[in-house]
A protein has these predicted regions:
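Short coil/turn connectors at secondary-structure junctions
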Residues: 52-56, 81-85, 106-110, 133-138, ...
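Thiamine diphosphate
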Residues: 57, 64-161, 181, 183, 190-342
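Short, highly selective alpha-helical patches that border small-molecule cofactor pockets
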Residues: 42, 46, 96, 100, ...
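General beta-strand structural signal in soluble alpha/beta enzymes
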Residues: 59-60, 89, 112-113, 139-141, ...
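Active-site pocket-lining segments that scaffold enzyme catalytic pockets across diverse folds
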Residues: 19-55
Length: 342
């Protein structure tokens, strides 16, 4: 194992090829058809990946049980055990990310770091350096919205997603279910020059019919309209994709033909061809609604001046998650109203 860590980029390429071979199997993309938090799905995927990538090494800022980033049977890295793969960074997020960058710069290791998404503010300077140096470090950032619930506004991210999305050369994935979470990990573990943030839910999310490996393109049609050019398009990410699909079903009964686009990663979507982007979001359809339980900053490029938003416009509050979504209007009913208003 020490030799694997010292040989640098050659072993990274060998492990990447092995990872791609395994990650392309049906087993990697197979999940139980039941509601599950994307942080929990992520933990299962991480442990699958460790079995084929011995050089996978990382940890959390004293939050591994909550962020689901402990690799079972991989041992804990310490002065007594250099062979351990789980690192206990303590509550020092900026140092954690700096160490992760250092491991990626060294070569031979594939590293990840983790904390609650709201604490990514402390990570930001090192995340920026990850992007600047084109290091494929993976940031596992959980508890991604007001879905955090009772911990209240100090622990509920609002503006953090827009901040990370604004960084050049940084892939920010907010998956809606298990399949999209697998796509996010696939990208994170196989790309060679882009840091990736996995922005994951605390609460259980349903598995969405229509979610697929197309998430690797950053954005795709998860529930299509019957018309080639729909009457309206609802664009969402993460936990709000299910709301968008529910709204589509209601609107179709009223005679409004709706397309739902899942947008787990804006940065990767922007790298697609103009033909692909036009096929997903035809310019001739100007009735668009963005749905996300975070700041709407950055959604304007897809919604435009004629569109509408079902997003957060304030900090959160302390209450059970379902009550918070109702309080702040992140509901199926409000998505339906937003489409009707256009």
């Amino acid at each position: 194992e020490m030799q694997r860590s010292l040989v640098g980029s050659e072993m990274c390429i060998r492990d990447r090829n092995l990872a791609e071979k395994v990650l392309d199997t049906e087993e990697f993309w197979a999940f139980d058809n039941k509601p599950e938090a994307t942080r929990s799905v992520s933990g299962k995927i991480l442990n699958k990946a460790k079995k084929v990538m011995p050089n996978l090494m990382g940890g959390a800022a004293d939050l591994a049980p909550s962020t689901k980033t402990y690799m079972e049977g991989a041992g804990d890295f310490s002065a007594e055990n250099y062979a351990g793969s789980n690192m206990h960074f303590g509550v020092r997020e900026i140092a954690m990310a700096a160490i992760g960058n250092g491991m990626m710069l060294h070569g031979g290791l594939r590293s990840f770091v983790s904390t609650f998404f709201v604490f990514s503010d402390y990570v930001k300077p090192m995340a920026r350096l990850s992007a600047l140096m084109k290091l494929p470090l993976t940031y596992v950032l959980t508890h991604d919205s007001i879905g955090v619930g009772e911990d209240g506004p100090t622990h509920e991210p609002i503006e953090q997603l827009a901040m990370f999305r604004s960084m050049p050369g940084f892939a920010v994935y907010r998956p809606c279910d298990a399949t999209e979470t697998a796509a996010a990990w696939y990208y994170a573990l196989t790309n060679q020059d882009t840091p990736t943030a996995l922005v994951l839910s605390r609460q259980n999310l349903p598995q969405i019919d229509g979610s697929s490996k197309e998430a690797l393109k950053g954005g795709y049609v998860i529930a299509d309209s019957t018309k080639e050019i729909p009457d309206a398009i609802i664009i969402a990410s993460g936990s709000e994709v299910s709301l968008a699909v529910e709204a589509k079903e209601i609107l179709e009964k009223e005679g409004t033909d709706v397309r739902v686009v899942s947008m787990p990663c804006m940065d990767i979507f922007e790298q697609q061809s103009e033909e692909y982007k036009e096929a997903v979001l035809p310019k001739s359809c100007r009735k668009r609604v963005a749905v996300e339980a975070l700041s709407d900053f950055g959604w304007g490029r897809y919604v435009g001046l004629d569109g509408a938003y079902v997003t957060m416009h304030s900090f959160g509050a302390s209450a059970p998650a379902d009550k918070l979504f109702k309080k702040f209007g992140i509901t199926t009913e409000n998505v339906v109203k937003a489409v009707r208003s256009l």
